[in-house]
């Protein structure tokens, strides 16, 4: 007769959870940030609001974004004029698009990750799907399982309405799943499209306009597992993961799903709330490792917007190159909510390899991944990079 303890021991993995592959995807429709204000005010029939347009132009100019990808094309917006008003009942039409397109974009990212992983998809044991775009039953996790042709016994977790911190959350959950289930291979997918948040401008709600200047569409997928086989190629190890609520930050970032879609509300002091609380998170994460020099680790921070990055950089005395990968993704894609940090992970390992650096983390051993979002919630993940083997010359 076996004991519970013996069963439990056999269930656990030996080593730490490891990122084994990363894939990303965006819609085909690309919008240029410099010309976006003209397009946005034209398509929303708001060209007469000249002062507001000038404000929006300044927001876009200061956003540090070059381009974004959006499922919503001019054609779709003309077919759905209610999306272009500030507060028109439009949830049904938004849902009809999101429920189909969110898993579809997620599938593209997942296929890319599975291809890099190089293992049969039948080895995927768990699926974690995260989106702030469109709620349904059965959810996007179910749709993705069907689209990819995964086994019916795959164990699914669906995360709706988490927001911008959730790229950290999915890694935290994948770590626990991989380390507590021997042989588990967890497919995590963050898929975000702005169809639920797009709306026309309002003079009285400039925080809504901030979102229109920043948000973009994208999906990222990561495969996580412990004890990699010789055929698998580890990219990063997940060492620890924490979540905390910043004190006195209630209402800093809110989102409400209404008949008019998903409305976002931001307080002006979000950058200072993040920058004032980030060092405590760093200390708690890295003190056990004996690390206190924040320039000695590689950085993957959710790029909520340029002001957050600037204040974090300033508060911690970070060298400008520390946030290079983060700023690159913000510039090339905008704020894709939960998917952003996974895009940054992808950018970092690729740039590290291309530059001939020794590790996947810009040549450094230890790194940190931050998610910031509604709550104000901060996710902190400690990463350990992997040595890059020199390719054949």
Curated annotation (Swiss-Prot):
Keywords attached to this entry: Acyltransferase, Flavonoid biosynthesis, Transferase
Pathway info: Secondary metabolite biosynthesis; flavonoid biosynthesis
Function: The primary product of this enzyme is 4,2',4',6'-tetrahydroxychalcone (also termed naringenin-chalcone or chalcone) which can under specific conditions spontaneously isomerize into naringenin.
Species annotation: Ipomoea batatas
UniProt cross-references to Pfam families, sorted A to Z: Chal_sti_synt_C, Chal_sti_synt_N
Reaction it catalyzes: (E)-4-coumaroyl-CoA + 3 malonyl-CoA + 3 H(+) = 2',4,4',6'-tetrahydroxychalcone + 3 CO2 + 4 CoA
Record protein name field: Chalcone synthase DII
Highest taxon of source: Eukaryota
One of the GO BP terms on file: flavonoid biosynthetic process
PROSITE patterns xrefs: CHALCONE_SYNTH (PS00441)
Broad EC category: transferase
